[in-house]
Amino acid sequence: MLEVLILAFALSMDAFAVSIGLGIKNKQNLKALALKAGLFFGIFQALMPFLGFLGGIGLREYIQGYDKIVAFILLLAIGGKMIYEAFNENVEEEISQITNKILLTLAIATSLDAMAAGYSLHLFNLNIYLSLFVIGFTTFIISYIGVYVGSRGGEKYESKAEILGGVVLILIGLKILLF
């Protein structure tokens, strides 16, 4: 279960960074924004790994014997992408009004990486539903907090959160590959 908690934390770093950005740009009605951001990000961070998990089960017979290498490569790619985006300054756009459509788009965009990471969940031999709940709930809490961090001048934390998330995903990939 420790692996799932670490994975949940790492996957939530994209949503945390975006939530900080939402808080920086929108200082009005923070409680509602934090709740909506947490719900959107939490639901999609739980849904996408489930889709990846189902895909992993479907592909298992074709890649048996290589599944640890595939999981490592996927987590390495996701982690590397997160680290790259942390250093790429032109990724963010100005968002003046946060609508449900914008939150939905951001939730999908930040959770696509989680779909690939979901493939590795079958390697942990844990209850998938509990794992997805932990991922979703962790993302909800971290996103909720991120809005408040951003509203209090959190510009300095955005890229650090993505770097940390990327490094943790790469380390999880190494653990899967080596143990």
UniProtKB/Swiss-Prot annotation:
Q: InterPro entries in the record, alphabetically?
A: Mntp/YtaF, Put_MntP
Where do transmembrane segments lie in this chain? 4-24, 39-59, 69-89, 102-122, 128-148, 159-179
Q: Which UniProt keywords apply?
A: Cell inner membrane, Cell membrane, Ion transport, Manganese, Membrane, Transmembrane, Transmembrane helix, Transport
User: In the record, what terms sit under GO molecular function?
Assistant: manganese ion transmembrane transporter activity
The name this protein carries in UniProt is Putative manganese efflux pump MntP
**Topological type in the membrane:** Multi-pass membrane protein
Q: Which GO terms describe its cellular component?
A: plasma membrane
The record's similarity note reads: Belongs to the MntP (TC 9.B.29) family.
- Identify the main location: membrane
Which one Pfam family would you cite for this protein? Mntp
Q: Does the keyword Manganese apply?
A: yes
Tell me, in a sentence or two, what this protein's role is.
Probably functions as a manganese efflux pump.
Subcellular localization, as worded in the UniProt entry: Cell inner membrane
- Recorded superkingdom: Bacteria
Q: Which gene encodes it?
A: mntP
Q: Does the keyword Membrane apply?
A: yes
Q: Whose protein is this, by species?
A: Aliarcobacter butzleri (strain RM4018) (Arcobacter butzleri)
